[in-house]
């Protein structure tokens, strides 16, 4: 059976999603992006769609087509079309009363209808889904703005047919967003009003829906077909053109390439300012060899766009007036469109409704595709009883894990894992003869536990005396369908066990905090990875030094090593250990160099001794350092020890 998908065919970006295994998956494209630009470009040699088309738009403006959604299903003499055509860098001409787009392709002049251009974008979305699902995709639910008339809807359906899709249904974008939040399920307490605030890349739509037992009625719509993220980008671009002029006495406003590079940087800065209070822009050789380095704060950005931001409230008032209801009668407000990530917009909307909580837990640029995928699953009968009830509660919103040596967050359940789920890993002790371990449970995306949220902790004591790395402690995380987490620890030698239960409300984060943490985590990811690598290098050096110490003092080996060698090696080990104690904040490179130094002393001595013992050749990797795969291998030792200093055996992470 072919799989059904939901496609949000947007003015500037499109998105595709699929419903399977009781959850919706937003499908990323070959660039790893979860939304794909609705761009098609024609060159001398090829046709490009999506990111590849948008990326070359600056070099090839006349043959790069976008905003086809503004033309689809309209007549050439439509005032909207006439107005839009003035601003497009590509040619729009009249063909039998309809607008068609004229481009140069492989050396010839070609014309394409808006339906054909949209069908190319839909084909791209279909291919993205097929690449991920590994099978043909035929059936799709495609979304359109609520104000689209019959001919625009039919033209969109035709675009789907051209793309080889069986369009199951054309549904309204606000309806799809409401379905995504399961608002059709919220209590069958008769009709309730839902306001959908959709601020996208190029358009702004506000819709008021009345939902009654799964029936959606569009009560009123309003908006601005020319207000969106691109306008905010323009304000930034103009601001920086002036700044460049002030600093360098040069005007870049006529140089297309410089403008395109500046616009790309501005779009990126705008996105960053949704999660951080300021950001920097660095463009090498922007114009006539001059580098442009500057920064902008969130406050300044909000000031530059203040009138645009405020103007988004006018259509909200209009929709309420048209539907003849008071704002206190609106039960749910749903944010859709990437531009609703802007904190100031969220605040304006919330304040307008007297501080009401907004629905924004689904990525705003994905909510429409999400709802379309649910609708597609329902229409193809590809659902389960569970679907209907816990459509949106079926993933762990943040990674869950425990703290291991060095304050490192070791994740057992990664974020977005489908729940219920169960996962076990084996850990060991950090010090010789350690009597107990403290199991601390955290949620969050950062590499160090201090940056994450502590959910609870418990002690597992009564571990019999043993060298570090020998005891095996199995930690199990188990989340049930209600999101309640049970964490247990079992010491395999004695069978001792301890557990803790963490319920949803106790110490868990709110949705807003989750969104904030996830966006911060992206920002900090690089620093985090560096820090994790540094701690890993430190732990590896420490483990190596201690396992060497065990090796030369262990019964079989100590007789094989000459007194001089033993003294030399012991001195090197002790120096390394005391250097480690004094150098907790050294760099990855320093730890690695120190390890190499120690290896250069140890390897010849150990291999000589192994030769004498007739054991396995190679240096004592002993039990390798922490990090990598926690496997619970017992401590290193005699001639059967791992070969080579860089042992390839499983690594054991240690719990303080």
Curated annotation (Swiss-Prot):
Residues 608-656 are annotated as: Disordered. GO terms for cellular component: cell surface; cytoplasm; cytosol; extracellular region; fungal biofilm matrix; fungal-type cell wall; hyphal cell wall; nucleus. InterPro entries: ATPase_NBD (IPR043129), Heat_shock_70_CS (IPR018181), HSP70_C_sf (IPR029048), HSP70_peptide-bd_sf (IPR029047), Hsp_70_fam (IPR013126). GO terms for biological process: biological process involved in interaction with host; cellular response to heat; chaperone cofactor-dependent protein refolding; protein refolding; response to toxic substance; symbiont entry into host; symbiont-mediated perturbation of host immune response; symbiont-mediated suppression of host defenses. The modification N-acetylserine is found at residue 2. PROSITE patterns: HSP70_1, HSP70_2, HSP70_3. GO terms for molecular function: ATP binding; ATP hydrolysis activity; ATP-dependent protein folding chaperone; heat shock protein binding; peptide binding; protein folding chaperone. Induction: Induced by heat schock. The promoter contains at least three heat shock elements (HSEs) that are bound by the heat shock transcription factor (HSF), and one stress response element (STRE), which is an upstream activator sequence (UAS) that causes transcription activation under stress. Expression in repressed by SSN6. Expression decreases after exposure to ketoconazole. Expression is also affected by farnesol. Disruption phenotype: Does not affect cells growth and hyphal formation. Does not lead to any significant reduction in killing by Hst 5. Keywords: Acetylation, ATP-binding, Cell wall, Cytoplasm, Nucleotide-binding, Secreted, Stress response. Transmembrane segments: none annotated. SUPFAM superfamilies: Actin-like ATPase domain, Heat shock protein 70kD (HSP70), C-terminal subdomain, Heat shock protein 70kD (HSP70), peptide-binding domain. Residues 611-647 have a biased composition (Gly residues). Binds human histatin-5, an antifungal peptide from saliva. Belongs to the heat shock protein 70 family. Heat shock protein that may play a role in the transport of polypeptides both across the mitochondrial membranes and into the endoplasmic reticulum. PANTHER family: HEAT SHOCK PROTEIN 70KDA. This is Heat shock protein HSP70. It comes from Candida albicans (strain SC5314 / ATCC MYA-2876).
């Amino acid at each position: 059976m072919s799989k059904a998908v939901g496609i949000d065919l947007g003015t500037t970006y499109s998105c595709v999603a699929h419903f399977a295994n009781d959850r919706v998956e937003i499908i990323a494209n070959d660039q790893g992006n979860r939304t794909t630009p609705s761009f098609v470009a024609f060159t001398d040699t090829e046709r490009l769609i999506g990111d590849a088309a948008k990326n070359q738009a600056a070099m090839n403006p006349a043959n790069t087509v976008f905003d086809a959604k503004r033309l689809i299903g309209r007549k050439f003499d439509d005032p909207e079309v006439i107005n839009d055509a003035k601003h497009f860098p590509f040619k729009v001409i009249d063909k039998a009363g309809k607008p068609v787009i004229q481009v140069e392709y492989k050396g010839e002049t070609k014309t394409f209808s808006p339906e054909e251009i949209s069908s190319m974008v839909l084909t791209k979305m279909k291919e993205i889904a097929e690449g991920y699902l590994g099978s043909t995709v035929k059936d799709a639910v495609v979304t359109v703005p609520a104000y689209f008339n019959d001919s625009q809807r039919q033209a969109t359906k035709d675009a789907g047919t051209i793309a080889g899709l069986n369009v199951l249904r054309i549904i309204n974008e606000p309806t799809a967003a409401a379905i995504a939040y399961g608002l059709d399920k919220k209590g069958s307490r008769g009709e309730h009003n839902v306001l959908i605030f959709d601020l996208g890349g190029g358009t702004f739509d506000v819709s008021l829906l009345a939902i009654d037992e799964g029936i959606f009625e569009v009560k009123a719509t309003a908006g601005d077909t020319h207000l969106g993220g691109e306008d905010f980008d323009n304000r930034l671009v103009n601001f920086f053109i002036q700044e460049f002029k002030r600093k360098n006495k040069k005007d870049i406003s006529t140089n297309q390439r410089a403008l395109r590079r500046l616009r790309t940087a501005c779009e990126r800065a705008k996105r960053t300012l949704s999660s951080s209070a300021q950001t920097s822009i660095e463009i090498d050789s922007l114009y006539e060899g001059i580098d442009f380095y500057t920064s902008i704060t969130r406050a300044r950005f909000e000031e530059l766009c203040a009138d645009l931001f405020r103007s988004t409230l006018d259509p909200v008032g209009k929709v309420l007036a048209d539907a003849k209801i008071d704002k206190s009668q609106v039960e749910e407000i749903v944010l859709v469109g990437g531009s609703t990530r802007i904190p100031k917009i969220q605040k304006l909307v919330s304040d307008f409704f007297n501080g009401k909580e907004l629905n924004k837990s689904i990525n705003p640029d994905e909510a429409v595709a999400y709802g379309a995928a649910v609708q597609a699953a329902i229409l193809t009968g590809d659902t389960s009883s569970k679907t209907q009830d816990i459509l949106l509660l079926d993933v762990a919103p943040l990674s869950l894990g425990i703290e291991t040596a060095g304050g490192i967050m070791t994740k057992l359940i990664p974020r977005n894992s489908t729940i219920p789920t169960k996962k076990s890993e084996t850990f060991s002790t950090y010090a010789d003869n350690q009597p107990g371990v403290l199991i601390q449970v955290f949620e969050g995306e950062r590499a160090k536990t201090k940056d994450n949220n502590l959910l609870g902790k418990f002690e597992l004591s009564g571990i019999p005396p043993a060298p570090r790395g020998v005891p095996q402690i199995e930690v199990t995380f188990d989340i049930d369908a209600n999101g309640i987490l049970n964490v247990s620890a079992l010491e395999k030698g004695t069978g001792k066990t301890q557990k803790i239960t963490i319920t949803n409300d106790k110490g868990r984060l709110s949705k807003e905090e989750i969104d904030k943490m996830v966006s911060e985590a992206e920002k900090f990811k690089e620093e985090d990875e560096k820090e994790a690598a540094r701690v890993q290098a430190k732990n590896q050096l420490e483990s190596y030094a201690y396992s060497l110490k065990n090796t030369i003092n262990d019964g079989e080996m100590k007789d094989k090593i000459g007194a001089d060698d033993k003294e030399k090696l012991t001195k090197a080990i002790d120096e390394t250990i005391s250097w480690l104690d004094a150098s907790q904040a050294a760099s990855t490179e320093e730890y690695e160099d120190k390890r190499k130094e120690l290896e250069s002393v140890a390897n010849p001595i150990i291999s000589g001794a192994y030769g004498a013992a007739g054991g396995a050749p190679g240096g004592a990797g002993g039990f390798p350092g922490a990090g990598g795969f926690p496997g619970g291998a017992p401590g290193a030792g005699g001639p059967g020890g791992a070969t080579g200093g860089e042992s390839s055996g499983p690594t054991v992470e240690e719990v303080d």
